């Protein structure tokens, strides 16, 4: 167990509730806040999660109060019962009565009945099932539909922008040779989305098709009954009985290599003056890219460019400008007006990334696309207004939006997007598991855009903009909240670990540039009041950003981890770089180092012999 102060790791003294581990024969799982995580059979993950979730009109997830929780574990299995209670706007209330049980034969059921005396508004209410992606992506599945028909197909390997399967009643996959897992969903119609779009490490099967209207009302005094049944079929002659957690994590040299990307820093008009005041810190990091943001619909105007020009003059780096184009007047009128303000301020970026502001809002399946000028016209106007700058295209939001609305890559000089790890879940495990999805994201981008120069960022733990609702979530008390515009873990060692692991996870993409932080503010590298680092000091994330900036352009070599869910690594010419992405110490074996111990969320470099 770790004795490290949680405040240093997470930026908050609030710790996550320890899950209750339950077993039924070879089936085991964690019960956490009334939902199920890490459902394994004979040590192999079968399902990542089964949860009963209630979403508000902005797709925020309610955190229900759990009452009358009763857990009974026996030699033959377990049974869990409780009541969950949600309180919505205007004194509306919803209760969910739950019974979860499993027997040693390999069957798990999760039964839930929702009821409301007041009526209750929701975007979605019911079960969500997560299948893992590593070792499962691209594998065969059998899908049973609500009309009884069967499809023998496969899970998508490249990320599917729309639902791969609809009108679902059950899905069956092979968990390991000789073991199949059928997940049966009763009580409503289910469909699957490829959650890798949002960098979630899962395929998500959820209740109620997105093509139906939302939000909708759950009517008073009309109970809604849903049930999930997991059936394991094991035809093997013997169990694995593998002690995969007992051995040290083994790190071995792989056979791929490349060049480390440039590192960028994002600077907004709101943080420009603070960034100027922290110019010494910027020069210490010495990033290769400065990425400036300009959004007229957020109140930005030409006055921002004077600060941008001063910053650009004080630090020798490539300069790029994100423009969220309102598209409310003629495109050429808007772009030339921005170009005129830039010229007046003496701000001459090397590249501009122009995207219609409306494209930052998601268009979910079944929804009507908003009015937007053709991207060909947007890019033509940008070329005319900024003839001496490289033109970037893509999305100022996330990969999801780029995957659903591919840009004409032949018209731009590079493609770009961001990611965010707290779109759907904000617990520590889910955030770190998003790293598994990153290689799938970059492969999917490369499949469309080939060897086009490719940039990612800004990608940070806190969310800078919410494409899926009307706002990002305020987080004044420093909790772990999905879609929050501040996250306490950004201030602790967790973010230092996450950022290096992020960079490792996208090495194979051959990125031109990677931006993982701002310089100041809630997305930045300087500490505020009440953080693990004294106010004005350097957050732990600073160390990773400075390290990556110092390594930019250098050769890297692949290192293969026997437990990539615990430790990730890469090599440079003279060093091994290791990162522990868990809350527990990890023992590692690598090259001449027989056994070394990495503290929770620790980053360590070792000299190669």
UniProtKB/Swiss-Prot annotation:
Pathways involved: Carbohydrate metabolism
EC number(s) reported in the record: 3.1.1.115
Catalytic reaction list: D-apionolactone + H2O = D-apionate + H(+)
GO terms, molecular function: hydrolase activity
Keywords: Carbohydrate metabolism, Hydrolase
Main EC class the enzyme belongs to: hydrolase
Protein purpose: Involved in catabolism of D-apiose. Hydrolyzes D-apionolactone to D-apionate.
Protein name, as recorded: D-apionate lactonase
Provenance organism: Brucella anthropi (strain ATCC 49188 / DSM 6882 / CCUG 24695 / JCM 21032 / LMG 3331 / NBRC 15819 / NCTC 12168 / Alc 37)
Taxonomic classification: Bacteria, Pseudomonadati, Pseudomonadota, Alphaproteobacteria, Hyphomicrobiales
UniProt gene name: apnL
């Amino acid at each position: 167990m770790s004795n490290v102060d949680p405040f240093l790791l997470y930026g908050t003294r609030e710790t996550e509730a320890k899950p209750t581990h339950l077993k039924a024969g070879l089936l085991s799982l964690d019960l956490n806040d009334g939902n199920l995580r890490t459902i394994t059979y004979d040590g192999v993950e079968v399902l990542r999660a089964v949860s009963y979730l209630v979403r508000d009109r902005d797709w925020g997830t309610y955190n229900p109060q759990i009452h009358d929780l009763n857990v009974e574990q026996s030699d033959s299995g377990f049974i869990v019962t409780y009541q969950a209670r949600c309180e919505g706007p205007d004194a509306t209330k919803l209760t969910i009565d739950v019974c979860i049980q499993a027997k040693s034969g390999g069957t798990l059921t999760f039964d839930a009945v929702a009821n409301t005396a007041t009526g209750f508004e929701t975007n979605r209410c019911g079960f969500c099932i997560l299948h893992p992606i590593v070792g499962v992506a691209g594998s065969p599945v059998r899908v049973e539909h609500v009309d009884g028909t069967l499809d023998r197909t496969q899970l998508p390997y490249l990320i599917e922008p729309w639902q791969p399967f609809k009108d679902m009643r059950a899905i069956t996959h092979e968990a390991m040779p000789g073991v199949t897992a059928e997940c049966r969903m009763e009580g409503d119609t289910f469909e699957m989305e490829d959650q890798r779009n949002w960098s979630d490490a899962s395929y998500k099967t959820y209740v109620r098709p997105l093509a139906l209207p939302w939000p909708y009302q759950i009517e008073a005094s009309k109970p809604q009954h849903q049930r999930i049944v997991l059936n394991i079929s094991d035809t093997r002659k013997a169990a694995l009985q593998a002690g995969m957690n007992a051995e040290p994590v083994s790190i071995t040299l792989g056979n791929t290599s490349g060049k480390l990307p440039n590192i960028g820093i994002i600077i907004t008009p709101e943080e420009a003056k603070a960034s100027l005041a922290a110019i010494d810190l910027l020069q210490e990091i010495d990033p290769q890219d400065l990425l400036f943001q300009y959004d007229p619909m957020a109140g930005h105007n030409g006055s921002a460019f004077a600060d941008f020009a001063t910053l650009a003059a004080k630090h020798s780096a490539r300069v790029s400008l994100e423009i969220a184009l309102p598209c409310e007047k003629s495109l050429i009128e808007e772009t030339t007006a921005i170009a005129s303000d830039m010229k007046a301020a003496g701000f001459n970026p090397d590249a501009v990334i122009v995207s219609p502001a409306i494209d930052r809002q998601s268009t979910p399946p079944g929804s009507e696309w908003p009015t937007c000028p053709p991207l060909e016209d947007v890019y033509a106007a940008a070329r005319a207004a900024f003839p001496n700058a490289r033109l970037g295209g893509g999305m100022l939001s996330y990969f999801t939006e780029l995957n659903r609305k591919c840009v004409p890559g032949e018209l731009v000089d590079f493609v770009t997007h961001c990611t965010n790890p707290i779109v759907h879940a904000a617990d520590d495990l889910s955030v770190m598991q998003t790293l598994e999805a990153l290689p799938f994201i970059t492969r999917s981008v490369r499949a469309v855009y080939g060897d086009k120069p490719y940039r990612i960022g800004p990608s940070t733990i806190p969310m800078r903009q919410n494409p899926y609702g009307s706002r990002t979530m305020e987080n004044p008390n420093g909790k772990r909240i999905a879609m929050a515009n501040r996250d306490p873990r950004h201030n602790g060692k967790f973010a230092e670990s996450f950022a290096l692991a992020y960079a490792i996870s996208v090495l194979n993409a051959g990125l031109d540039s990677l931006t993982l932080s701002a310089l100041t503010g809630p997305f930045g590298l300087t500490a505020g009041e009440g953080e693990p680092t004294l106010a004005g000091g350097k957050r732990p994330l600073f160390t990773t950003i400075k390290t990556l900036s110092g390594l930019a352009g250098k050769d890297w070599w692949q290192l293969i981890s026997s437990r990539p869910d615990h430790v990730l690594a890469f090599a440079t010419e003279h060093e091994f770089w290791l990162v522990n992405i868990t809350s527990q110490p990890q023992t590692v074996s690598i090259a001449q180092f027989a056994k070394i111990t990495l503290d929770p969320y620790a980053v360590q470099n070792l000299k190669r012999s």
